[in-house]
Amino acid sequence: MNILSRALRRPKSPTPNGKKRINLALQGGGAHGAFTWGVLDELLNDERIEIEGMSGTSAGAVNAVMVADGLTRGGPEEARKRLSDFWRAASRDGDMSKLNRAISERLFSLIPIAVTPFQPWFDAMSRMLSPYDLNPLNINPLKDLIERFVDFEGLRADARPLFVAATNVQTGKLRVFTRENISAEAVMASACLPAIFRAVEIDGVPYWDGGYLGNPVLFPFFRATETEDVLIVQINPLERKTLPTSTREIVARANEITFNSSLQSELRAIEFVQRLIDQGRLPHGMGPSQYRYVRVHRIVLEGLGERFSG
């Protein structure tokens, strides 16, 4: 939490009550989504902070809608409770089929994927069969969990900006779902890993995981919110000090690079725009033809050594 502590020492985006207003951008695509839960629990418990807007992709989208739903229902404490209840339900063993268990582990495991008991079985099967073969009934435990925990009608009525990213399979373009059109299907689309699930269709358009094109998306914040501070909760490491040599390690690292590429591009664009503002080549301000400074902070999942979990 050191990066956040440094950002809070000199609040530049205060609310009338003196709190630090931030936008939260929650990454997905990794095996450690519960790390984000822990970070969010601390942030929601910090009375210095107020969340203005949220963006999430894949598991990050799931966490974002859980927080948004809790804030709408009863504030930070309710958001903490809903996160806790959801993650405990997602990790509960229960009476699941082998397929359901493997899918749940792949999406929500509280421990690295490489050591979950059904993952080797599922990996082997998914190399031979597509989700249309392996999962003919289109079973998706995520859908049941999302619908059980989130009041989407109430969420759509809330004023807090919310953005969920998905990938249009046919056009290869990014789709950002906003608060006004958020739904369980939109969250499922954002978390639709194509090796596991059939594409999620919304209004006849098929979608896959949003991590391919926006993990997470930052640009919607710049017009929809006032704060200039964006806090990214990042679970895919940008750098590795060791060279992957096994098949599992190579696949894991390739996935990390793939699911970080869009974030890298957005961060470069932010830096470029701010350099042009400093040079006086772009107008600075909040107007429709003006550009803003953005202060980006990151909390990164580290300390797991150089072990890969694919």
Which stretches of residues belong to each language-model region?
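Small-residue-rich anion-binding loops in enzyme active sites
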Residues: M1-A25, R160, V169-Q170
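Active-site-adjacent alpha/beta core region of enzyme catalytic domains
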Residues: N23, N100-V233, L238-T242, M286-G310
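A short, acidic, amphipathic alpha-helical segment used as a generic capping/interface helix at domain edges
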Residues: I277-P288
